[in-house]
Amino acid sequence: MDENNGGSSSLPPFLTKTYEMVDDSSSDSVVAWSENNKSFIVKNPAEFSRDLLPRFFKHKNFSSFIRQLNTYGFRKVDPEKWEFLNDDFVRGRPYLMKNIHRRKPVHSHSLVNLQAQNPLTESERRSMEDQIERLKNEKEGLLAELQNQEQERKEFELQVTTLKDRLQHMEQHQKSIVAYVSQVLGKPGLSLNLENHERRKRRFQENSLPPSSSHIEQVEKLESSLTFWENLVSESCEKSGLQSSSMDHDAAESSLSIGDTRPKSSKIDMNSEPPVTVTAPAPKTGVNDDFWEQCLTENPGSTEQQEVQSERRDVGNDNNGNKIGNQRTYWWNSGNVNNITEKAS
């Protein structure tokens, strides 16, 4: 017993305190011997650092305690557990701890001395220098790549934040639109208002239509037709004055000739250009004296010409919004055109 005490007095304090701490049965819930009594296990590292380390070593650093164990040759048995083993650290045999020695740290001057004892050749030295330079370059490249990756990560995070803000703004805008549409659709008179608006819009489009070009063309064609008839009557009057010998012909033949021209005037094609015809020679039969007296005293076609100009002004100034077909009077009816033939009857 005295031998054991004497041997333990020469042991390092760390080993002595560690043995006492592990061998204390009151702390078996925190640290205890393993089943084979050749290693010890730290079951609760947090409580071990908080309660036991301050009591035996006056600090709470569990990592420092592990480094001390490594210094004295302890090794970890199970990577999943805090179990440490040393062949000379056995339960009930504290005297074996005298074989445990602290490892000497390796310092830089020791390496220099080792190199001095074993000098390198020139080729080995150059090879090692090249390898060191290559490793430095690789290190610089890795650091640059790391910086680039870090910069890209920050930019990506900024883009994600911006997109989130835009998404939230769009969601709020969409909600406001949906709420407004729901409020508008909830009004009872909405459908009627929409129908009235569509009807007014259609009426405005119909009223804003320009005058039909086809109607204007028909007016121009009719005007040219009237001019043609005016010239025809004038030539007939002149030729009838020159041929006075033919005035004694039967009036019935003249009436028949004029009657033949009446249906022709009522069948004028308003959609075609007036044909250019050669004036036939005046009939040799006599005509009505009253008819030729009226032709010589009046300006044939003047009344019709004034009516044409008046009607064209009415067509051009029709801006009241009503349909052209409803208010326009087609003055090119056969009745107006046949005025010439009626005078002859």
Swiss-Prot record:
Subcellular location(s) per record: Nucleus
Keywords: Activator, DNA-binding, Nucleus, Phosphoprotein, Repeat, Stress response, Transcription, Transcription regulation
Main location: nucleus
Intervals of motif AHA1: 226-235
Extent of Low complexity compositional bias: 274-283
Domain notes: The hydrophobic-rich region (HR-A/B) corresponds to the oligomerization domain. AHA motifs are transcriptional activator elements.
Descriptive protein name: Heat stress transcription factor A-4c
